[in-house]
Amino acid sequence: MPQSKSPTTEAVPIETRNGYGTTIAAVIHLPAGLDTGATHPAVVVSPSGGGVKEQTAGLYASKLAANGLVAVAYDASFQGESTGMPRQLENPHLRTEDISAVIDFVISLPYVDTHRIGAMGICVGAGYSINAAINDPRIKAVGTVSMGNIGHNFRNGWDGSVADADAAHMLAQGATARIRDASGEGSERYPLAPRRKQDAQNREQEDEWEYYHTPRGQHPNAPGIMTARSLTQIITYDAFHKAEVYLTQPLLLISGSEDGARWMTDEAHDRAASRDKALYVVDGANHMDLYDRQPYVDDVVSQLASFFADRLSRSGA
C-alpha cells in the first residue's frame, strides 16, 4: 500500500507518567495525505542499543510511514535528546517502560486507534519490544529485526557460547562502577559497540563499529557507550521472561541468514505463546546489514508493512 508522496514528520516531547520523570524526544512519521479525521493503526519503533531516532529506528519509521502506517521513532530515556541522568544509562527495565510510555502518548492522538498499536525494534530494541508486549497487552502485533536480547548478549556472547556463570565478573564490574558513582568519582563508561575496528571479535562487530563510529551511520547523540553501572541491571535481564505465557500477540521475527546472533530470534520464536508467529530470513544478510543496507532494508520493510497492515487491520484486533 505505498503512498505517492513522501511522509511528513513531527517532533514531539513525551512527558512520561511512569515515575522516572523523563521527557522522551520522539518523531512521529505520518503517511502522506493521512486523513486525520479518521483513526489509524500506529507502530512504535524502538532504537538499537545506544542508538537514536535519527539512525536505523528513524529509517524504519520513515519507510513504514511511506507504506501507509503512522510510525513513531524515539530516543530512549537518558539517551539522545531525551532527558534523564546519568547520561547513557542503559537500564533494560526502563527501556521497556519507555515503549509503554510512548504508547501512552500515541493513544492520545486523535488520528490513532487505541486498539491498533504495534511495536517493532532493531537489535536490543527488538528484545525490548518483545518484553513490552509481554507486559503491555495494548500492543497488538510485534515485529523484530536482527533480534537482540540484551541480557543474553552480555551474559552469553554474540553466538551464545558463554555460560551464564562466566558473566559474573561483569556484575562485579557494574557494582564497582556504582561504588565510584556513589563516591563522586565520576560515571564509568562501557562500550556498546567496539570503540575501534581492531576491538571487534568478528565481522559483524566490525560492521557495528563502522555503523556507530564512521559516516555510515554515526550520530553525535549516539556515542556507542553506556554507563558501566548498567551492567548490574543487564546481566540478569531476560527480554523473553514469561513469553511462554503472556506473549500471545502476532509476531514477525526477521533476521539475516548470516546473522551470528540469530539464535536469539529463534529462541523468541520458540518461547512465544503466540499461535500466529513467523520467522522471515533475509538471504545473504548479516546482523548489521538489516540496519541500513539495501536491498535488505526494503525487503524487511515490505514484510513488516504487510504484517502490520494485516494484523492491525481491525479495531479491537
Task: Label each residue range with its predicted role.
Residues 130-211:
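Alpha/beta-hydrolase-fold enzymes
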Residues 56, 89-110:
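Alpha/beta-hydrolase active-site loop
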Residues 63-83:
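Conserved alpha/beta-hydrolase
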Residues 38-48:
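Short beta-strand element of the alpha/beta-hydrolase
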Residues 246-247, 253-255:
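Short beta-strand/loop motif that positions the catalytic acidic residue
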Residues 49-62, 76, 265:
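The serine-hydrolase catalytic nucleophile loop
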Residues 2-38:
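N-terminal cap/lid segment of alpha/beta-hydrolase-fold proteins
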Residues 285-298:
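Catalytic histidine-centered segment of alpha/beta-hydrolase-like enzymes
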